[in-house]
Amino acid sequence: MAAERGAGQQQSQEMMEVDRRVESEESGDEEGKKHGGGIVADLSQQSLKDGVERGAEDPEEEHELAVDMETISLDRDAEDVDLNHYRIGKIEGFEVLKKVKSLCLRQNLIKCIENLDELQSLRELDLYDNQIKKIENLEALTELEVLDISFNLLRNIEGIDKLTQLKKLFLVNNKINKIENISTLQQLQMLELGSNRIRAIENIDTLTNLESLFLGKNKITKLQNLDALSNLTVLSMQSNRLTKIEGLQNLVNLRELYLSHNGIEVIEGLENNNKLTMLDIASNRIKKIENISHLTELQEFWMNDNLLESWSDLDELKGARSLETVYLERNPLQKDPQYRRKVMLALPSVRQIDATFVRF
């Protein structure tokens, strides 16, 4: 994300995307874990240090001396500006950036979103890991496509209804308790609200272009109000309070479903989700593999940490000819001394059992 175009911009975009996969991991998205690869784990590690939630930091950090923007030299012709971890305390002096398209201000000491009205060419704004309590003063940025205000102190989703070109919105690890004020964001393709205090899926009926929805690590008790999201391909609901798989009948394009760390007892409600390639139901209370024989495109099936006892249940997966990875560890059937051999015999296409690759 250097001030120059070309290779610098490409590297910038790759770094920010990988960072966001780390964010997705925080919301319980195993896809983020698979692809994140730890490339930039150190960037988010500062926020996760000792498991301290934002808003309860060391008081001394609150009084860290901010840098005066006058001491920072800005390239007036830059299209990509990266001021990551500069100890900036106030957004000011950026009006000279007439050509800027991507502005990264992550890991600073910013408390208020302000003085950005002149940056009307801005497409991407990254405010990850600051001290922002309110989304405000963004109305002029009507061309914005990517907005990241993760790891801040937000309590409400507000002040973004004019950002109608927004395609990706990241509000991970805040204190948000309700999904609201996003009905005008009809171009949105990715919505990441993991690690908040949300109790219900609501107010997303107009987001018909949404492809990825991440709501892991919240307090949601029911899968509902998803009918309009027929273009959804990824749904992450890990670490919530779900007890039943339901409300997915219209998600006919769903390819990845993450439901681990809930209170689900029965595999059901997936009759119309024939395109699933990834199903994660680990760490629930499920005793039986059932109702998924029609999921013939499955490539990964994660059901570790459940109550599975019967080997015959694996027959339910035999139609998935492309199945390569299964996680079944910490189920009662793993106690069988022939555990790995029996999995291999039942599912000959599998190349990875739990964390270990199959040897031939």
Swiss-Prot record:
<feature type="repeat" description="LRR 7">
    <location>
        <begin position="209"/>
        <end position="230"/>
    </location>
</feature>
<keyword id="KW-0007">Acetylation</keyword>
<dbReference type="GO" id="GO:0005634">
    <property type="term" value="C:nucleus"/>
</dbReference>
<keyword id="KW-0539">Nucleus</keyword>
<feature type="region of interest" description="Disordered">
    <location>
        <begin position="1"/>
        <end position="63"/>
    </location>
</feature>
<feature type="modified residue" description="Phosphoserine">
    <location>
        <position position="24"/>
    </location>
</feature>
<feature type="modified residue" description="Phosphoserine">
    <location>
        <position position="12"/>
    </location>
</feature>
<dbReference type="GO" id="GO:0005694">
    <property type="term" value="C:chromosome"/>
</dbReference>
<feature type="modified residue" description="Phosphoserine">
    <location>
        <position position="27"/>
    </location>
</feature>
<comment type="subunit">
    <text>Interacts with PPP1CA, PPP1CB and PPP1CC/PPP1G.</text>
</comment>
<feature type="repeat" description="LRR 10">
    <location>
        <begin position="275"/>
        <end position="296"/>
    </location>
</feature>
<dbReference type="GO" id="GO:0007059">
    <property type="term" value="P:chromosome segregation"/>
</dbReference>
<feature type="modified residue" description="Phosphoserine">
    <location>
        <position position="44"/>
    </location>
</feature>
<comment type="function">
    <text>Regulatory subunit of protein phosphatase 1.</text>
</comment>
<keyword id="KW-0597">Phosphoprotein</keyword>
<feature type="repeat" description="LRR 5">
    <location>
        <begin position="165"/>
        <end position="186"/>
    </location>
</feature>
<protein>
    <recommendedName>
        <fullName>Protein phosphatase 1 regulatory subunit 7</fullName>
    </recommendedName>
</protein>
<dbReference type="InterPro" id="IPR032675">
    <property type="entry name" value="LRR_dom_sf"/>
</dbReference>
<dbReference type="InterPro" id="IPR025875">
    <property type="entry name" value="Leu-rich_rpt_4"/>
</dbReference>
<feature type="modified residue" description="N-acetylalanine">
    <location>
        <position position="2"/>
    </location>
</feature>
<feature type="repeat" description="LRR 3">
    <location>
        <begin position="121"/>
        <end position="142"/>
    </location>
</feature>
<keyword id="KW-0433">Leucine-rich repeat</keyword>
<feature type="repeat" description="LRR 1">
    <location>
        <begin position="77"/>
        <end position="98"/>
    </location>
</feature>
<feature type="repeat" description="LRR 2">
    <location>
        <begin position="99"/>
        <end position="120"/>
    </location>
</feature>
<comment type="similarity">
    <text>Belongs to the SDS22 family.</text>
</comment>
<dbReference type="InterPro" id="IPR001611">
    <property type="entry name" value="Leu-rich_rpt"/>
</dbReference>
<feature type="domain" description="LRRCT">
    <location>
        <begin position="331"/>
        <end position="360"/>
    </location>
</feature>
<dbReference type="Pfam" id="PF14580">
    <property type="entry name" value="LRR_9"/>
</dbReference>
<feature type="modified residue" description="Phosphoserine">
    <location>
        <position position="322"/>
    </location>
</feature>
<dbReference type="InterPro" id="IPR003591">
    <property type="entry name" value="Leu-rich_rpt_typical-subtyp"/>
</dbReference>
<feature type="repeat" description="LRR 9">
    <location>
        <begin position="253"/>
        <end position="274"/>
    </location>
</feature>
<feature type="repeat" description="LRR 6">
    <location>
        <begin position="187"/>
        <end position="208"/>
    </location>
</feature>
<feature type="repeat" description="LRR 8">
    <location>
        <begin position="231"/>
        <end position="252"/>
    </location>
</feature>
<dbReference type="Pfam" id="PF12799">
    <property type="entry name" value="LRR_4"/>
</dbReference>
<feature type="repeat" description="LRR 11">
    <location>
        <begin position="297"/>
        <end position="318"/>
    </location>
</feature>
<dbReference type="GO" id="GO:0019888">
    <property type="term" value="F:protein phosphatase regulator activity"/>
</dbReference>
<feature type="compositionally biased region" description="Basic and acidic residues">
    <location>
        <begin position="17"/>
        <end position="34"/>
    </location>
</feature>
<feature type="repeat" description="LRR 4">
    <location>
        <begin position="143"/>
        <end position="164"/>
    </location>
</feature>
<keyword id="KW-0677">Repeat</keyword>
<dbReference type="InterPro" id="IPR050576">
    <property type="entry name" value="Cilia_flagella_integrity"/>
</dbReference>
<dbReference type="InterPro" id="IPR003603">
    <property type="entry name" value="U2A'_phosphoprotein32A_C"/>
</dbReference>
<feature type="modified residue" description="Phosphoserine">
    <location>
        <position position="47"/>
    </location>
</feature>
